[in-house]
Amino acid sequence: MVRIGLQLKANLENVTNLKAEGEDFRWYLMLKCMNCGEVTKQWVYMCLMESQPVKGGRGYAHFVSKCKLCHRENSVDIMKDSIHPYLASHNGKFHTIVSFDCRGVEPTDFSPRTGWTAEGENTSTPFEVDLTEKDWSDYDEKAQNAVGVYGVTSQFIKL
């Protein structure tokens, strides 16, 4: 078992509490097989609402697949209690937003996409955030100012 943390870095403008919303949020990852080094050719996703049985009766995981090259079964489990928001106080710094229990694979890339929420820094106005382009902007009517999330980047660390 290897625990991997996904860290996010972004510049938040007049918003805070950027988070993956709900148990149906899809974490899109590229994965590398630790047995043979094969990297997935397409994005794979996992979410808390979906789980699959792990071969050999070892419980369930949020993502289970067989490596196309070496045919080894690998799995990833989202650590539910490790999901945290990215706050305005983290602005411009890497911060761990989720941890994965990886067996046989390790993530190499993350695609943020849709399903994020944030709130106005001074107004708590809720916003639905789409990070497909790694930038998002809107207008907070209550505060009468622009809001946005810019320059989203990510990295993985071993925990």
From Swiss-Prot:
Q: Which InterPro entries match?
A: CXXC_Zn-binding_euk
The protein depicted here goes by the name UPF0587 protein v1g245604
A Pfam family name for this chain?
CXXC_Zn-b_euk
> What does the sequence similarity comment in the record state about its family?
Belongs to the UPF0587 family.
The record's listing under PANTHER family reads: CXXC MOTIF CONTAINING ZINC BINDING PROTEIN
- Listed GO MF terms: zinc ion binding
What is recorded about the protein's domains? Requires a bound zinc ion for normal folding and solubility.
Q: Which UniProt keywords apply?
A: Metal-binding, Zinc
Q: Which domain of life is it from?
A: Eukaryota
The record lists Zn(2+) as bound by: 33, 36, 67, 70
